[in-house]
Amino acid sequence: MKQFSAKFALALSAAAGQALAASTQGISEDLYNRLVEMATISQAAYANMCNIPSTITVGEKIYNAQTDINGWVLRDDSTKEIITVFRGTGSDTNLQLDTNYTLTPFSTFSECSGCEVHGGYFIGWSSVQDQVMSLVKEQADQYPDYTLTVTGHSLGASMATLAAAQLSGTYDNITLYTFGEPRSGNEAFASYMNDKFTATSADTTKYFRVTHSNDGIPNLPPAEQGYVHGGVEYWSVDPYSAQNTYVCTGDEVQCCEAQGGQGVNDAHTTYFGMTSGACTW
């Protein structure tokens, strides 16, 4: 096992070197700390928002019994932001959504012309859409000078992406952070997200798609089925740090997706040392 681990580490190091040629290694400590904070919130969603920063007020819960979609609308008065977070896969019901790869018209949001999204996640989003829009509006009306943030891990990452897209039709001040996000839609959807969230470069992006090592979930659903990633990828390589975070723009297969990870693996469940729902950070 140690020999295998050593070989894998060498292979990953070599792959990181190749990615460096096409990407930028290292981000600012401020941005790194921000990504860690959002990862903390996303991982805490698996365990009823445990151990989140003390500045955050936990508000109303988002929930639908038929789809088992869970989330919360939070508020951080220290940063003046309203945060919507979605839990990742936590049940067999969620797994049924995960494996429904049929591309489906994004019919709840007509502004996204030609957009098709993951069929299972669209079912999930449709089941909580009214709740989310209502709860966010309630907070935004009460705190009009606050910005909006949407985040989530795994299934929750794709839910966050669909939510951010829909919210973008009403609000301009949205930032999206996803962790271990599956491919959420087709090329038209990715293009819409990149345009709306200025994700054509790391200097302007408001769509931070964070990946880790050889996380296998960002490789799903297969690109061959018409799926395309959006956002600017921030690829975290162990040992995790600001310096070991790569900024990957352009071809999505040059960083995490090039590592050959398959499905749910250790790299998927743990981001920046925090394991989904463990609450040990």
From Swiss-Prot:
InterPro entries: AB_hydrolase_fold (IPR029058), AB_hydrolase_lip/est (IPR051299), Fungal_lipase-type (IPR002921). GO terms for cellular component: extracellular region. GO terms for molecular function: feruloyl esterase activity. It catalyses: feruloyl-polysaccharide + H2O = ferulate + polysaccharide. The active site is at S154 (nucleophile), D215 (charge relay system), H268 (charge relay system). PROSITE patterns: LIPASE_SER. Keywords: Carbohydrate metabolism, Disulfide bond, Glycoprotein, Hydrolase, Polysaccharide degradation, Secreted, Serine esterase, Signal, Xylan degradation. It is found in: Secreted. SUPFAM superfamilies: alpha/beta-Hydrolases. GO terms for biological process: lipid metabolic process; xylan catabolic process. Substrate binds at D98, Y101, H268. The keyword Disulfide bond applies. Pfam families: Lipase_3. Disulfide bonds join C50-C279, C112-C115, C248-C255. Its EC number is 3.1.1.73. It comes from the Eukaryota. Residues 1-21 form the signal peptide. Involved in degradation of plant cell walls. Hydrolyzes the feruloyl-arabinose ester bond in arabinoxylans, and the feruloyl-galactose ester bond in pectin. This is Probable feruloyl esterase A. The gene is faeA.
